[in-house]
Amino acid sequence: MSGHRNLKRRCGESHLESPAGCAHGPAAACVLSKLVQLPTPPLSKHQLKRLEEHKYQSAGRSLLEPLMQGYWEWLVGKVPAWIAPNLITIIGLLINIFTTLLLVYYCPTATEQAPPWAYIACACGLFIYQSLDTIDGKQARRTNSSTPLGELFDHGCDSLSTVFVVLGTCIAVQLGTNPDWMFFCCFAGTFMFYCAHWQTYVSGTLRFGIIDVTEVQIFIIIMHLLAVIGGPPFWQSLIPILNIQVKIFPALCTVAGTIFSCTNYFGVIFTGGVGKNGSTIAGTSVLSPFLHIGSVIALAAMIYKKSAVQLFEKHPCLYILTFGFVSAKITNKLVVAHMTKSEMHLHDTAFIGPALLFLDQYFNSFIDEYIVLWIALIFSLFDLLRYCVSVCNQIAAHLHIHVFRIKSSSTHSNHH
């Protein structure tokens, strides 16, 4: 979810396979490497220089963090010193994604009931991700392998995890029966994560509230366990006095959380940034990042409401994943803009997927919307992965480090 507080300047470690090594590797590996690499480096020399100078800054502490510190310290002590922090993060993310996809498989419309073990697996997957996402920073400091890449990698994984976590929660409470609520909850989650980094782009400091990521994740784990214990009858039962279904309660909590968080975020954003004349850390308008997330949500809402075949109602999981990948990419670009003190540009290949859906509807669904949704999903995922791999490779090459491996004799501290 929202870039874990225990990141603490953690940044990461290694080189994915780079195209430079193609001449010495198998032809298939060379083709694959080129396929997932952008044709031109995503970051300029000036951005890389400013990235080296970046310092991680955070403020605030959540309610459960002091209580969880003992467990996190114990857990990181069990991790071998040779395991890179980024490897810890990616393992947690993959587990989180896999367990959520189990629910997507059994509940494609978020109205079905999955086997009890699937909800338990999803709860465990989220807890594992939370634990590993927290200790990666501790592992980086413990092994003296903190670099700016790790901070970016951590936030990047969080941006993708957010999409799967909110989707898994909606499936657990069978919110697909209320598509408007499901749409709101999923996009509210990605919007709040984006806003957390938007205010960081403005102020230069990542702020945490008394109720933050850890608390929300524990609440979601409880939702999954309640799905095991109560099942559909529980979510469909009415809350006395309020006379609303129990499944609407988590949605109302999302509304309250969105209002509370956005009030804090926009309080920072509208107060003025640390740049010249109250601008962002990059000297740009404090409102400029809204164009990106605003475009994503506006396109998602228009396509949802204008679909003649009830595309979102019939395929909510595919729909949320498609726009979730788009949101994850623009969030990653916002984090990069913050860390490199550079401007965000609105034109981006991330919008191609949503644009295909929009144009298909404009021409009266010339192609089946379901087919176009799959095309948009695959393209958006590929576009996200291609950007992330390219950025990680470029930064790792620049800092002479590895993404998933700790160099035996390194001077990572030079890049703190």
UniProtKB/Swiss-Prot annotation:
Its main location: endoplasmic reticulum. Its EC number is 2.7.8.1, 2.7.8.2, 2.7.8.22. Mg(2+) 1 binds at residues 133, 154. The chain crosses the membrane at residues 89-108, 116-133, 156-176, 180-199, 210-230, 246-267, 286-306, 315-334, 349-363, 368-388. GO terms for cellular component: endoplasmic reticulum membrane; Golgi apparatus; nuclear membrane. It catalyses: CDP-ethanolamine + a 1,2-diacyl-sn-glycerol = a 1,2-diacyl-sn-glycero-3-phosphoethanolamine + CMP + H(+); CDP-choline + a 1,2-diacyl-sn-glycerol = a 1,2-diacyl-sn-glycero-3-phosphocholine + CMP + H(+); 1-O-alkyl-2-acyl-sn-glycerol + CDP-choline = a 1-O-alkyl-2-acyl-sn-glycero-3-phosphocholine + CMP + H(+); a 1-O-(1Z-alkenyl)-2-acyl-sn-glycerol + CDP-choline = a 1-O-(1Z-alkenyl)-2-acyl-sn-glycero-3-phosphocholine + CMP + H(+). Its cofactor is Mg(2+); Mn(2+). InterPro entries: CDP-OH_P_trans (IPR000462), CDP-OH_PTrfase_TM_dom (IPR043130), CDP_ALCOHOL_P_TRANSF_CS (IPR048254), CHOPT (IPR014472). It is a multi-pass membrane protein. The active site is at residue 155. It comes from the Eukaryota. Keywords: Endoplasmic reticulum, Glycoprotein, Lipid biosynthesis, Lipid metabolism, Magnesium, Manganese, Membrane, Metal-binding, Nucleus, Phospholipid biosynthesis, Phospholipid metabolism, Transferase, Transmembrane, Transmembrane helix. CDP-choline binds at residues 86, 151. GO terms for biological process: phosphatidylethanolamine biosynthetic process. Catalyzes both phosphatidylcholine and phosphatidylethanolamine biosynthesis from CDP-choline and CDP-ethanolamine, respectively. Involved in protein-dependent process of phospholipid transport to distribute phosphatidyl choline to the lumenal surface. Has a higher cholinephosphotransferase activity than ethanolaminephosphotransferase activity. Belongs to the CDP-alcohol phosphatidyltransferase class-I family. Homodimer. This is Choline/ethanolaminephosphotransferase 1. It comes from Gallus gallus. The lineage of its organism: Eukaryota, Metazoa, Chordata, Craniata, Vertebrata. The gene is CEPT1.
